[in-house]
Design a protein with these regions (language model features):
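Positively charged, polar, low-complexity stretches
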Residues: 2-91
């Protein structure tokens, strides 16, 4: 991995842990730590764009309270599955 890609991953991890709400910190932070490095380039670009979205929208999308925009749907599904598996193991 080159220096630019490493810097981008570090920046996205930091932004995942330092959101506007603690709830999204606890959802996106662990996801970024566990899964960000293995995402393909196109999904990384989508994740970077996702980080610019409002936390109130993100939490509704992750919790399934409203449908995410189509461009974010695959990422939101992965994030929700990761959070569910981490926070509600065995369910």
């Amino acid at each position: 991995m080159d220096k630019t890609a490493e810097d981008a991953l570090k920046r996205m991890r930091m932004r995942s842990w330092r959101r506007g709400t603690k709830e999204m910190d606890l959802i996106l932070g662990p996801f970024a730590d566990a899964r960000l490095a293995e995402l393909p380039g196109s999904m990384l670009a989508g994740y970077d764009a996702l980080l610019a979205e409002n936390d109130q929208d993100l939490i509704r999308w992750v919790l399934g309270q409203s449908a995410p925009p189509a461009r974010f749907a695959p990422l939101i599904a992965q994030i929700a599955a990761h959070a569910h598996g981490r926070l509600l193991p065995g369910l």
